[in-house]
Amino acid sequence: MSDKKWTAEQLAAITTRDTNLLVAAAAGAGKTAVLVERIIGLITDPHRPVDVDQLLIVTFTNAAAAEMRERIGQALSKALQENPHSKRLARQLTMLNRASITTLHSFCLDLLRRYFYQLDLDPGFRVADEVEAELLRLDVLEELFERRYNQDNVEVFARLVDSYGGQRDDSRLQDLVLELYRFSGSHPLPVQWLTSLAENYVIPEGKTLDDQTWIVQIKKTIFQEVEGVLGLLKQAQWLAKQPGGPEPYSKTLTEDIINIKPLTNNDWDASWEKLYRSITAIKWSKLSPCRGEIDDQLKNKAQNLRNKAKEKFNDIINTYFSAEPTVILEDLRSLQPLIADLAKLTIEFMELYQKKKQAKGLVDFGDLEHYCLTILLDKENDAAEFRPSAVAIELQQQYAEVLVDEYQDINAVQETILRLVSKKNNRFMVGDVKQSIYRFRLAEPKLFLSKSELYANTDNCQGTRIGLSKNFRSRLEVVNAVNFIFRQIMTKKAGEITYDELEELHCGADYPQAEDVKTATGPVEVYLIDRKDAQLEEQNTDSAEEKLTDGEEQEDLDSDQAEARLIGRRIQAMVKGTDKAMGPEFKVWDKEIGKYRPVSYRDIVILLRATTGRANTFLEELRTMGVPTYAEVGTGYFEAVEVETFLSLLKIIDNPRQDVPLAGVLRSPVVGLKASDLAEIRLCSKEGDFYDAVRIAAAADLGDVAVTLTKFLRQLENWRSRARRDTLADLIWLLYRETGYYDYVGGMVGGTQRQANLRVLYHRAKQFEATSFRGLFRFLRFVERLKDSGSDLGAARSLSENEDVVRIMSIHKSKGLEFPVLFVAGLGKRFNMMDLNKDMLMHKELGLGPQIIHLGSRVSYPSLPKLLIKQQIRKESVAEEMRVLYVALTRAREKLILVGAVRDLEKSLEKWCTSTYQAGWTLPDAELMAAKCYLDWLCPAIARHHNGHELRSLAKTEGQPFSEVATDPSAWQLVFQALKDIKNQTQENKEQSQGLLVKIKDMEPFEDAGLIKEVERRLSWQYPRAEVTTRPAKAAVTEVKHKFDELARQEAGVMSYRPKISGRPRFLQQDKGLTPAERGSAIHLVMQHIPLDKLPDEEGVQVLLQNLIQKEILLPQQAAAINPNHITGFFASSIGQRVLQAPKVERELPFSLALPATEVYQELPECGDEMVLVQGVIDCLVDEGDGFLLIDYKSDAVYPGQDSPVDRYRGQINLYARAVQDILGKPVKDRVIYLFNNGQIVHI
């Protein structure tokens, strides 16, 4: 076991054997380190050692799998270094490359390659690119619908199309089929699940609603909602009885409570008919008038609460009891044939799609898991019990343990696969259900929760639950803040899990105390922006809450701008300081250098719930303020003017009779006409399409315009001809060259980004043609499909994430990462519940919930199953949003800052402080589940803290919060900001800048406030070490090695003389073959790619050369220059044998090494701490456990009288060795130059 100090819980997770283990690892708990240590422990167990290829290690991304393999390799290398004579450890390192450390998709693909013959699959099958799969699905849908329309009996299908197809065509029904197909794929037996969907709507004559299995859940929902109404009435009654309260209201409120209370008795046996009669019979009396001295505030609050209760009760009636039970029953019966036909249509699509893929030798990502299940399930399997096949039993015997990372994100299909390849007690599952945020990918956190509850029972023998609650990431201030919030809001009912002692974080991070350094300690900052002056009217309907309007989009834009400006100012104050205190506000801990350093832009990250449509606003505002910012924006690509213009050009090459694209191209720099020219062209032919007008105008007497059009039409005809002959990628590159558009956009503002966007289009076209689809028309159709579905390619990257910039990313992208300073913005933005408005809802357990549509009257209303499913989806979505918030807050290492905007702070405060004085830690479940945004959780929780007194004061509430909550050790700093103040401040800055520019332009004097001297000081500043500025700050090893060589010769008393011999010009040489440098590069490429699993022979080298030519890694003339005997000679040598036997070999390994400037440039005077970055690439580095063997390849010819290779390359090799020792921390025990021309081994 490693020397690392493990906690007792970590040690248990590492060492516990012979049982299924579920490790609930909280954020920052070091789960990956524990997982790696467990694997090493299994391999090195002195009693029952396991080979690394006897482990199945499943991760959820390729990057995670690669990191896991690397970390296991490092741990094995370290173990081998401590025990260099262990043949077993050396063998484990050798086997590591073939070990099953993989994503589940890759595991399934490997199984398909081995057992394809069981599936009627072409052995040469390939996995379809998502683009190809999407296009194929569209083709299949069109063919399927065409078949359905041509069938004799289409009555049910026609009704299905009319009901759910959309207003103009059947596109919405096609989308519904695709959605249902994808959704069913998360079920282990999708066809059986689809077939069962209509069962909920089979209601025989004589049966009632009470005979339906789902009616009890509907009643439960109604009872809960009625309890919420009762709670509001009780709050109003309590206010009425307070001193100064509206006492006359008490009698009416008591009557209300007496009338409503019987409906909350959870009478499950009560018939729907009885429930209908009871609820619709409720009447509301008028409140008695209040006389005398009454507190108006208490009176208004009591009135508002009762009005809210009445509204909620009326909503219950309108939602569930708008029709007689007999009417509802008949409507449900009418849905059965529609649901059955929809399921049948989806199954037909599935089968036809499968046939098309098999015909093309394709599988898609959805197939991988289901094909794998087919292999692993016994052929006589039934749905009630998943029995393993012979292949599954064989795999069970092969794998000593199955280890699963991120288990909280598993789905039912994946769980079934893992169960089938596992023994009874050899599963190790690690994850954190509080971080399960992939519901949109159909992840099922309930699988984790059910195991957690089962294994937590000590009497259970199926497995053991171990909790890792120590957080080694965040400062105590962050840990306390997270615990304070989630103790109150994450309940079993609202968040699907109780945030108790088992789940809360315990601080384990060690941030050294620094008395002379200001660190990032201090309260969590919360900025609340009041949008009241935006003058946007509040919309109170449910539909307005769940559906964005244009007004809300404008509101979001204003909120984003305001938040960005506020954040920008806070960042500038952090990094640059303020007028009162210049310089960075605090220092952050840097693990790499082991000390505190000033906070910089790269330490800061801004998290948004989603970056789509929002990150660009933040980017624009922050960059305007001078804050360097980076965001990997997933949208905006198709809106980029250069992409739009070029797609228009491709469209008219495909079909020039498209008016809008044609006009766009003519107006663009590709042709360069003015708007007036376009008007003149249209006047030449007022009828017909614009292309005809262009042709007529080209032949008319229009001067330069006619000349330009003639040239363009000639080019267009040539391009259309090339489009029929050339590949799509070649056509696009030809257009870039011939139009000069690629170079043109490079000269525009943001030219680098624009050119990158055009390159993405070229590469996307290349990827498209690698599929089974071809042609410009299909490519354009695919692009339009992407646009219509709201998908995007994402703007190309033109800036590295590692630069000193503030990064903006989505919360989902941040998962698994950590940041010194974290802003979580957009906390007032509404949760996206738009999916709840669809005509058809689907749920994995409850089935389908359709809208009932009467085609004759076009009247529609939600069916009871839809209402149930809607409620369940909303509940699950709210729980997921709570987990998303948990992920966001736990990314912070040292400083956490929360920012949100609200429409009306006064109204929001009234809502937030409703339960401030409730006893106990948790807030009411009804209030938590009714949240519309993250602030609806954060602010009610903070209002109960002693730092939340401002929230309580502004809400005008009295009393003391629950003492245990109020005295919590977390610390909060609340800052209130009006939107108008942020806008005014920004406007003032603009006006000041504009006024200053006007005065400068008019050469008028202005008050400098000491600025002139400061400007003069900055402009006259000179670098103190002018000599250093004449030398490069970055150099390659080959550039500086001569300086070390010369120094070494001087120390040895050797002087070299190398006469300069000018080579003949290339055109005078008889042999125009490769230069020595080019031949050397070719040898390096071969040595980089040659397999090391066996001794290469001449035939093997020839095969490798052909493969490298096919992959365009090597040119044919380079391959011709390679002598296979030189390659085989290397591996036959003693050095080559050491390479083949080594457990780990790195080839073409790049490095960067910072050296003192005086060490590189000895002629310079003392340069203080000036450094030079030296970069190089090591040809071959062999890890032999106790040290490295460093090999440098040379293809130089050695002639008599020349310096020996030792003299020529000593400096270079010594630099390489120094870099290895400094960076990897292990000595280089042997330094070798291998000369390929004569097979000589030269030791340095």
UniProtKB/Swiss-Prot annotation:
GO annotation terms (biological process): double-strand break repair via homologous recombination
Indicate whether Nucleotide-binding appears among the record's keywords.
yes
Every UvrD-like helicase ATP-binding domain range: 4-475
Gene Ontology terms for molecular function: 3'-5' DNA helicase activity; 3'-5' exonuclease activity; ATP binding; ATP hydrolysis activity; double-stranded DNA binding
Q: Where is this region: Disordered?
A: 538-559
Q: Read off the NCBIfam families from this record.
A: addA_Gpos
What protein name is recorded for this chain? ATP-dependent helicase/nuclease subunit A
Which species does the entry assign this protein to? Desulforamulus reducens (strain ATCC BAA-1160 / DSM 100696 / MI-1) (Desulfotomaculum reducens)
Q: What is the lineage of its organism?
A: Bacteria, Bacillati, Bacillota, Clostridia, Eubacteriales
What gene does this protein come from? addA
